[in-house]
Amino acid sequence: MTNMRKTHPLMKIINHSFIDLPAPSNISSWWNFGSLLGMCLMLQIITGLFLAMHYTSDTMTAFSSVTHICRDVNYGWLIRYLHANGASMFFICLFLHVGRGMYYGSYMFMETWNIGIILLFAVMATAFMGYVLPWGQMSFWGATVITNLLSAIPYIGTTLVEWIWGGFSVDKATLTRFFAFHFILPFIITALVIVHLLFLHETGSNNPTGLNSDADKIPFHPYYTIKDILGILLMIMFLMTLVLFFPDLLGDPDNYTPANPLNTPPHIKPEWYFLFAYAILRSIPNKLGGVLALILSILILALLPLLHTSQQRSMIFRPITQTLYWILVANLFILTWIGGQPVEHPFIIIGQLASISYFSIILIMMPISGIIEDKMLKWNS
């Protein structure tokens, strides 16, 4: 068996990726989220496949087909809520994974990091299109509002929006193509994940100290396989608690009303995991400016390797940058809260201040703090 593991063309790849992979001996639980994300992706593809067997992408029957899944299909309610809340778990793990990368300087692996950003955009696009499929009020109006943002693009904007809609409004053509894209994107994401891992295994994993760990490596199996299994069990416990006790906790009640183009919901808002970006979008009075800020709120991650001014990779020994990092985390919570509030005083000004803080911490304060910390180290020596 050992020979086959190391000689068989397919087994050899698996062996080098998950069994005999040299891993740093000191990576903490923050390094568990990669495997949890893989688990989430598998769960979403499997539950999604079973949902697609019963779903119809037609404006007349989409809402009814989701109701039929929940009421008449064996364990349909479980599959549907696993899929809906699985998306929330996916984003929780994604945000923690990206946060880990920012804290420990993993963005210095530029190829891995950039593929990660592409993955983040792909997952966000998939989740957005998935939210449209049940064809409830928030599905319809969310699709209308978000796709309409593209009309802010000069000259080609309006044509582009009508091309995406497949008509002059969000209708049957839009729903059908969103279903098609929502089905195909997870497989594209899976391919990107393989590329992400390929680039990661070229350099090896980072570790909490940010120092080179070549002198102190341990095999991935059994040390990190058992650690990943523990993480997966904890995630399943959390997800099942959510699904079985509070399935609608993270959803919107408006989505239990069938889509009606003649009746606008009082507060149009996306799912919770987009609220921070939605708050940044709304905080700018200009339409094109808002759209650019929305895209930049994620794309700013690509600038992190260029904005890294410190001699140290990780934030573990950098108290000023650490403080700024946790202020940034708190700021993202504030943005998420603001994104779910109506556009009125005092939420408008809070959103604007939080948006300015978000960009200034990343673009200005963190690079300056890196330089200051380096100077402080020189003074002490």
UniProtKB/Swiss-Prot annotation:
State a single Gene Ontology molecular function. Answer: metal ion binding
Tell me the SUPFAM superfamilies matching this sequence: a domain/subunit of cytochrome bc1 complex (Ubiquinol-cytochrome c reductase), Transmembrane di-heme cytochromes
Membrane spanning segments where? 33-53, 77-98, 113-133, 178-198, 226-246, 288-308, 320-340, 347-367
Q: What is its main location?
A: mitochondrion
Family annotation (InterPro entries): Cyt_b/b6_C, Cyt_b/b6_C_sf, Cyt_b/b6_N, Cytb/b6-like_sf, Cytochrome_b, Cytochrome_b_C_euk/bac, Cytochrome_b_N_euk/bac, Di-haem_cyt_TM
Q: Where, in this chain's numbering, is heme b b566 bound?
A: 97, 196
Q: How is the cofactor bound?
A: Binds 2 heme b groups non-covalently.
- What is its membrane topology? Multi-pass membrane protein
Coiled coil located at which positions? Answer: none
Key word Cell cycle present:
no
Q: Which miscellaneous remark does the UniProt record hold?
A: Heme 1 (or BL or b562) is low-potential and absorbs at about 562 nm, and heme 2 (or BH or b566) is high-potential and absorbs at about 566 nm.
Q: What family is it from?
A: Belongs to the cytochrome b family.
Spell out the protein name for this chain.
Cytochrome b
Q: Which gene name belongs to this protein? A: MT-CYB
